[in-house]
């Protein structure tokens, strides 16, 4: 028979986004008077001085506690105190992304994500029934949060795309090309077998270059 059973779920979220409303800078717009094919790209070149930023963080904690009543001891007159059974999980996820259209032809994107675990001592977290254990848990959690938790998984990605301004050059206005670069990095913590034995971590790294080109022969011969 169950004497008492408690389940507690906590979740806290925070998100921040910054999107700049800054007019792009065109350094050559007024310097170059002519607007022929060779100066058109320079006059249209615009620099964005600030990127857009997004940050998200979430903390999730689950605590379950159950206490069983000793019916056998009550019947025989010999009480047998059954220990409390409990389980707990405390996680902290963080994500960051940056998007920067540095020029009207060059776009840069960076994103990263971390899954961390908040370290908790294996004690009954009950302020009334176990005040010493609760204080130990509280101090340990504060320290783990100050250390940003124990990272379990980390991912990051970097992308850059450049639209080559070939169509603005008179002799190449029949072509269109773009160059892109993509790099990813992944890290996973290895499993912990015991206090003294840990499996190795897993790291993955990948890079990729892409070049795409289109040729418009109708524009070439017309």
Language-model features, listed with the residues they occupy:
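Exposed, low-structure sequence patches enriched in small/polar residues
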Residues: 1-222
């Amino acid at each position: 028979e169950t004497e008492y059973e408690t389940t507690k779920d906590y979740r806290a979220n925070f998100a921040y986004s910054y999107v700049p409303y800054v007019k792009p800078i065109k350094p050559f717009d007024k310097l170059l008077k002519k607007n022929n094919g060779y100066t058109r790209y320079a006059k249209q070149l615009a620099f964005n001085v600030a990127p857009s930023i997004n940050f998200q963080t979430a903390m999730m904690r689950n605590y379950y506690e159950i206490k069983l009543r000793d019916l056998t001891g009550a019947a025989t007159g010999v009480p047998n105190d059954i220990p409390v059974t409990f389980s707990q999980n405390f996680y902290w996820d963080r994500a960051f992304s940056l998007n920067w259209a540095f020029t009207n032809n060059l776009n840069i994107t960076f994103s990263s994500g971390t899954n961390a675990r908040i370290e908790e001592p294996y004690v009954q977290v009950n302020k009334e029934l176990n005040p010493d254990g609760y204080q130990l848990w509280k101090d340990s959690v504060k320290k783990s949060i100050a250390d940003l938790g124990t990272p379990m998984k980390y991912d990051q990605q970097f992308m850059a795309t450049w639209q080559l301004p070939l169509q603005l050059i008179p002799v190449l206005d029949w072509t269109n090309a773009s160059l892109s670069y993509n790099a990813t990095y992944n890290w996973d913590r290895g499993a912990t077998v015991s206090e003294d034995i840990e499996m190795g971590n897993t790291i993955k790294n990948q890079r990729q270059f892409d070049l795409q080109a289109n040729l418009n022969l109708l524009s070439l011969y017309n």
